[in-house]
Amino acid sequence: MRSVLFLCVKNSARSQMAEGLGRVIFGDGVRVQSAGSEPSHVSPWAIQVCREIGVDLGGQSSKFVGTIDPDSVDTVIRLCAEEVCPATLSGKQHYYLPIDDPASDDPDVDPEEMRARFRRARDEIKEQLTSLAAILDRSETSA
């Protein structure tokens, strides 16, 4: 079974949404997981906006990338800039999805703006994963 690992720093928002969306988009033939270099918690905003489209992140948790067995991963998908994203798992197929971090520590960001930011990130991730699924399918059939 093919395996995809989504990476970002905190494994809180983008990579968690990508993990949940990836399970739906890639289907049962792909094992999907996520991790970060400084894991924290799954963002309640990520849980909420994914639930809006029927994707449940409830069983997911933030994980440290060092706990992932490198032999269990075929493809690494980074969702943060290379200079801050954990660089790991050499020898694997790598992709970069440039998705802006929707999270903010700014107390002036109101709940509606925060929800809009997370929805925008969710929709960008969904669109890019849909395109990537076709690429992964082609590389699987040509292998």
Please report, for each region that a protein language model flagged, where it lies by residue.
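Short glycine/proline-enriched coil/turn segments at helix->beta-strand junctions
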Residues: 27-29, 72, 89-93
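Conserved small-residue
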Residues: 11, 50, 76-77, 125
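Conserved active-site segments centered on acidic
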Residues: 1-66
